[in-house]
Amino acid sequence: MTTVIAFALISCEDSGIIESEVVELDFSTEVTMESAEEDVTTITDAADEMFQLSFGRTENGVRDEILDCATVERDTVNQIITIDFGDGCEGRRGRVRSGKIIVTYDGDRRTIGSFRSVTFENFFVDSTQVEGTRTKTVTDVDADNLSITVDITLTGGKLTFGDGTFATREAQKTRVWAFDASGDHVTTVSGSASGVNRDGLDYRMDITEDLVFQRSCWRAGVFVPVSGVKMFTVGESTAIIDYGDGECDNLATKTQDGVSEEIELSVRGRRRRG
């Protein structure tokens, strides 16, 4: 497990950045952190699918693609799956991954009580290093409706960006994996996260309406939720992010200080106005 380096917090006044600007700037970091979490989830699920089926179904288009240039090995004695991207390989969506993701598992993920613990060894997505420990525990399985409910805890989470800045994260979330009427894989996420942003300031994120991710959107290069609402707080300043009504796009509505605007989201840590 990676140890997060402690550092002195700086105030908005000392840093010369007002809180409303911090929320605006830091939300781009939130998008990147959330995208990194989803990326890791997709990769580890794909590796899981190599060795066992979920409800007798596969999703070859996505599963195979994300592991195209990775070496995946399973140690059945110690119950460890190692996903190795080597010195770096570019996926079909333009993301370059390097290093290793290590999954310690116990039980079939369709079984209540089974778990997966995910750690990283020098793992990067593009120029951003991903660290921390993610533990996933299955709490409910509904075979009739083809859904699995999982509690996920992130401890010691950290992203270190190419410019040397970093952000930390602790999170507690619940995810429900299911298939909709069209057969698309849909994930709903609830929960919260907190940490220290790239400016050294404490932040908190609360999901106030469940986030919805669609695997078909991932195929189209959309790595953000298609619907759901977040509340993002830095100091006394709060922003509300509404991801919309299910469209496969990178657009969201940000409301801050009573002013709403449409924004375009970038998973590489920058926010572009629409």
Stretch-by-stretch model annotation:
Residues 1-3:
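Sec-dependent signal peptide recognition
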Residues 7-11:
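C-terminal motif of bacterial Sec signal peptides marking the signal peptidase cleavage site
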